[in-house]
Each structure stands twice: as structure tokens, then as C-alpha cells.
Amino acid sequence: PAHRRFFDPAHYRIIVTDQRGAGRSKPLGDLTDNTTDHLVADMEALRERLGLDSWFLFGGSWGSSLALAYAIAHPERCRGLILRGIFLCRRPEVDWFMTGMRRVFPEAWRRFSEYLPEAERHDLLTNYHRRLIDPDPDIHLPAAKIWAQYEGACSTLLPSADAASSFADPAKSLGLARIEAHYFVNDLFMPEEHLLNGVERFRHMPGVIVQGRYDMVCPLVSADALSRAWPEADYVIVPDA
């Protein structure tokens, strides 16, 4: 519902999807054949199944990444892109998530890092990933909860009990944390600059980039880089978000 409300159902046919292993997709947290290319192929299969010649794509954070990847692969099927909270799948963005946000949210990061034994804190991603893919729920569920709570604590400009509680949901936390760690350790299954280098494939189509200036999970520097590579797109910075 949160995503549907951006659009008037009297004017648009709204299609909302949950990617492999996340949300209502089953099995939850499954990593089998779970790569960026598989997700792009799933989107294309869905378009064909619904009998759509083309569609607009709307996505935020990782959703912005996936929309860009799809537009690079299938520009002829896109009418336009509406993107918010840009994530370009580059190593500095992953490093920022894992360690950089401690500069703004040190207390949240301490809870995140200190969940691991001291000897494992030199490589948070590797050691969280190892726990998150462990088949034992007594190992992967607590790690997923801590990961999701960290992201939730850093995801809003002002503290939000509602946001924190939504990230603490066990089902959401496992789908979120396990899949994020899986993609992070595999470099998001794409070359470092793939999304920026692919702008030429879709720069002719309408585009809107919306970015909160104080987005901590997806810092503004990524939206700025995309806007510079794609100056034809409308670029809106929300000053107090």
C-alpha cells in the first residue's frame, strides 16, 4: 500500500512486485538463482505475462538500482523512470552502509558491530553474511534482527518508532538482511560502474530523480552522480528529508 499510494489508480495500472526471497515471495530469504540478472529477467517475464508492451518503473534505494539495471537491459520496454533515494551499487556505498554511518549514528552502529565477537568486527560484512546464510534459525534470525534494526535506526531523518518497529518484524528482517548481505558480498552482481556507464541506453526517455538531502542509507552523492550522467532527467532534492 505504501508504494501504491504514489499513483492514482484511476489513471494508472499499478503493479507492485516482491523480488525473489523478499516480502511475500516464497521461500522467504531464499538465495537460489538470486542475482541482479535473475531479478531483471523476472521483471521482463512479468511484463510479458501481463501483456504489457511497455511500462514506467518506480523504485527507491535498491529499487532504483533494479529499475536502472532493467532500463539498461530493456530500454525499448520502458516509458520512463521515477527514482528516489539513489543507490548505484558501488563499493563506497556498501562501505558507507557497513561502517560509514557510524559517523552520524554511532550508537546504532555500536549495537550493530558489537553483536559480533570482537575478533570478527574487522570484517562486519563477511561475518554477518556467514551468520545470515546459516541454516539454523537460532543463528540467522538474531543476526537478521540486529542488521534490520541498524538499517531502520539510520533510515529516517528523525527517530521514528514506527519505522523501527517495521524493521524489527522477523519476516521482514530476514528477507532484508540475508538478501542485502548476499548482494553486498557479491558486489551486487554487476561491474562497479555498470549503472552509470549504461545511462546512454536510456537517456532519451523521461526521468525523475528525487533525493532527500539527509538520506543516510543512500547518501545524496549517488543521486548527484546520476544527475550529472543523465542531465536530461528532472532532479529534485528534498531539503529536509
Residue ranges and their predicted role:
Residues 7-26:
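Conserved alpha/beta-hydrolase
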Residues 37-56:
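Conserved acidic catalytic loop of the alpha/beta-hydrolase fold
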Residues 39, 57-59, 84, 210:
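Short beta-strand immediately N-terminal to the catalytic nucleophile in serine-hydrolase-like folds
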Residues 76-128:
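A catalytic-pocket lid/entrance helix-loop region that shapes and gates access to the active site
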Residues 220-240:
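Catalytic histidine neighborhood in serine/cysteine hydrolases
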